[in-house]
Amino acid sequence: LRLEVVKNLALDLGHRLEILAGEDTSTDSFIEAALACADLATLAACNLPALPDGEKPLAAAATHLAAGTTRALISLVESETGTLDEAHAENTLKDARSAVWRADLAVRQLVS
C-alpha cells in the first residue's frame, strides 16, 4: 500500500511538472517547478529504505536528479527577481530558499 501511495504521489508531481513545462517561463512557473522537484527529491529519499535492494540506486539517482534540477531552476529564479516588485521578489526568494533547503535535506537523508 505504501509503495502504491508513493507511486501516485510521484505521478501527481510528474503531472504538475508537465503542466508547468507547457506554461510560460515566468518566475512563478520556475518556483512551482522547483518546489515540485524538491518534493520529488524528498519522496524518493524518504522511501528508499522501503525499496528492494535492486531499486535503491534508482531512488538515490532520482533524489540527486530532482535536487539538482531544483538548484538549477532556483538559479533561473534568482536571475529574474530583479524584474519583480519588492514584495513579490521577497516572497519568491523565500520560496526559493525553501525549495533548496528541502532538496538539500533530501540528499542529506541519503547519507544518514
Regions found by a protein language model. Name each.
Residues L1-S112:
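Conserved, well-structured ligand/cofactor-binding cores
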